[in-house]
Curated annotation (Swiss-Prot):
Mn(2+) 2 binds at D97, E100, E225. InterPro entries: FBPase_class-2/SBPase (IPR004464). Its cofactor is Mn(2+). NCBIfam families: glpX. It is an enzyme of class 3 (hydrolase). It comes from Thermosynechococcus vestitus (strain NIES-2133 / IAM M-273 / BP-1). This is D-fructose 1,6-bisphosphatase class 2/sedoheptulose 1,7-bisphosphatase. Belongs to the FBPase class 2 family. GO terms for cellular component: cytosol.
Amino acid sequence: MDNVIGLEIIEVVEQAAIASARWMGKGDKNMADQAAVDAMRNRMNQIHMRGRIVIGEGERDEAPMLYIGEEVGICTRPDAAQYCNPEELIEIDIAVDPCEGTNLCAYGQPGSMAVLAISEKGGLFAAPDFYMKKLAAPPAAKGKVDIRNSATENLKILSECLDRAIDELVVVVMKRDRHNDLIQEIRDAGARVQLISDGDVSAALACAFSGTNIHALMGIGAAPEGVISAAAMRALGGHFQGQLVYDPAVVMTKEWANRTREGNLEELKKAGITDPDKVYEAEELASGETVLFAACGITPGMLMKGVRFFKGGARTQSLVISTQSKTARFVDTIHMFDQQLKSLQLY
């Protein structure tokens, strides 16, 4: 699968990022998202595969979607027999977030990117549109820190694993009211906090690379993005755990103002989740034999530059990670829109 569609999924996120970047700074997050969705769907439908969206985006925000259950790829067309050999058919599950950090893109802030993860059919956890408590950490701390520990205890373990003083550690936390106690605990333990408004996939990724000055991600975010983060962290050998959150009193968000703990538990039960308190490891959220992750910066971020337009073209920076080839490739691409382009932007 890696050799067949690895390059093509890079183009999927590149096209989504370019389309969304045209709306960067214009204050309309829905248009930034819609442009990314349309571009991502269009490019995926040009790939020789039978793909199924298992993690879509937008339900909670009432935004445009690549909806859960949607089929994409040339081999899903009514005339697929003309193009696809059933014996060579690639069936894959796909998790997408065409514009992760829509507000970041809309207001020209760093950290927005187009992301997706793929695996063979059944290889990605079909997370419900709930919230998830998350813990991400570098490979050196894999299996040593634990989401069931207090933040203070995990910071002590992380300090030992990384051979750093606690006051040299930086923890990323989303700026939400529900995290006030967590933020205070991290600070009281002596570590530093980097607050972000959106985009915790990027923060989870940053934990796996030395030199980013990000050593952990803690807190509650969206469950679908948790699966995407887990796919990347599994491929990178980093630590990732997730635990679904179903209590509106814990989430503290207006989107769940009319929901109840009991109603959420019933919804999870209907979704086939019999243990709502289960702690999921990265290998359970992205369990496939082969897992691919791809991202392309829309605005400048921790790991990738954003889309840069120039006369007649654009330049993108992407990242593709594979469990099959055990690689993390940074891809710098010049896109030539104008056939009469007189020069290319080198940097």
